[in-house]
Amino acid sequence: MRDLKTYLSVAPVASTLWFVALAGLLIEINRLFPDALTFPFFSF
C-alpha cells in the first residue's frame, strides 16, 4: 500500500515536469524557427 501511495505521488510530479520541459522545447523551436512547416535541419 505504501508503494502505491509513493507511485501516486510521484506520477503527477513527473508528468508535470515532462509537460513543462516539452512545452519549453516547443516554445524555443518556434522562437528559433517561426512559422516553420518544414525544419531546415531535416531537409537534405
From Swiss-Prot:
Q: What transmembrane ranges does the database entry give? A: 7-27
> Which cysteines form disulfides?
none
**Entry-linked SUPFAM superfamilies:** Subunit IX of photosystem I reaction centre, PsaJ
Entry keyword Transmembrane helix: yes
Assigned GO CC terms: chloroplast thylakoid membrane; photosystem I
Keyword presence, Thylakoid = yes
- Write out the annotated subcellular location: Plastid, Chloroplast thylakoid membrane
Q: According to Swiss-Prot or TrEMBL, what is its membrane topology? A: Single-pass membrane protein
Q: Name one GO biological process term.
A: photosynthesis
One matching Pfam family: PSI_PsaJ
Q: What are the record keywords, sorted?
A: Chloroplast, Membrane, Photosynthesis, Photosystem I, Plastid, Thylakoid, Transmembrane, Transmembrane helix
The free-text function statement in the UniProt record for this protein reads: May help in the organization of the PsaE and PsaF subunits.
> Which family does this protein fall into?
Belongs to the PsaJ family.
Q: Specify the protein name.
A: Photosystem I reaction center subunit IX
The source organism is Cicer arietinum (Chickpea)
Q: Which gene encodes it?
A: psaJ
